[in-house]
């Protein structure tokens, strides 16, 4: 089953961006290559139950089993040792990526309280967009009664474009709600 956002990208966004950016080849048009979702857990070392609930929540949100990220070396100031669980991470590609991006744009972001749009300064200079969410309740897959604690997550949308302007044009064409469109 092809995703709705993927067919919209192929049929509408690609011809529009090809004309705007004046590319000769259709493969030069920027595209979303992957989405990385990271959820850091400070209390995972003391509470194994929080790690399990975060794994469950992230698998509900993404539809894919997350991996547990571990500390590379010991840091006494944070009271962690090497190989201790410090977070949960998921990398989405292909159809799962388009399904998540569609739900993020059309379901999750409009449910944020006092949402004014995404900040267009959150690009990293290489065409990748980063956003942070403060709670997981905005996703319809999460049941309010079954969560133990509100946890935020970092979402990185990696594009094939080499600069921020092309990536911003791509995400605006896909429907991402930015505060000021195309000011980069």
Swiss-Prot record:
- Annotated protein name in UniProt: Large ribosomal subunit protein uL5c
Q: Name one Pfam family in it.
A: Ribosomal_L5
> What is the similarity comment for this entry?
Belongs to the universal ribosomal protein uL5 family.
Q: Gene name on record?
A: rpl5
Identify the InterPro entries for this entry. Ribosomal_uL5 (IPR002132), Ribosomal_uL5_bac-type (IPR020930), Ribosomal_uL5_C (IPR031309), Ribosomal_uL5_CS (IPR020929), Ribosomal_uL5_dom_sf (IPR022803), Ribosomal_uL5_N (IPR031310)
Highest rank taxon of the organism? Eukaryota
- Where can this protein be found? Plastid, Chloroplast
- Keyword rRNA-binding applies: yes
Q: Which GO terms describe its cellular component?
A: chloroplast; ribonucleoprotein complex; ribosome
Q: Cite a single GO MF annotation.
A: structural constituent of ribosome
**Any coiled-coil ranges, and where?**
none
**What UniProt keywords are attached to this protein's entry?**
Chloroplast, Plastid, Ribonucleoprotein, Ribosomal protein, RNA-binding, rRNA-binding
Instruction: Keyword check for rRNA-binding, yes or no.
Output: yes
From the UniProt record, give one GO term of the biological process aspect: translation
């Amino acid at each position: 089953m092809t995703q709705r956002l993927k067919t919209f990208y192929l049929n509408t966004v690609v011809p529009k961006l090809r004309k705007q950016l004046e590319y000769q080849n259709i493969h030069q048009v920027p595209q979303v290559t992957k989405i990385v979702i990271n959820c850091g857990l400070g209390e995972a070392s003391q509470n194994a139950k929080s790690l399990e609930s975060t794994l469950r929540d992230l698998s509900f949100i993404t539809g894919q089993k997350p991996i547990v990220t571990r500390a590379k070396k010991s840091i006494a100031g944070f009271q962690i040792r090497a190989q201790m669980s410090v977070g949960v991470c998921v990398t989405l590609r292909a159809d799962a990526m388009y399904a998540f991006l569609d739900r993020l744009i059309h379901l999750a972001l409009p449910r944020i309280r006092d949402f004014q749009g995404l900040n267009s300064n959150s690009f990293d200079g290489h065409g990748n967009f980063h956003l942070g969410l403060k709670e997981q309740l905005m996703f319809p897959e999460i049941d309010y009664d079954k969560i133990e604690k509100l946890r935020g997550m970092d979402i990185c949308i990696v594009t094939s474009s080499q600069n921020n302007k092309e990536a911003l044009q791509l995400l605006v064409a896909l429907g991402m709600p930015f505060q000021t469109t195309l000011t980069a």
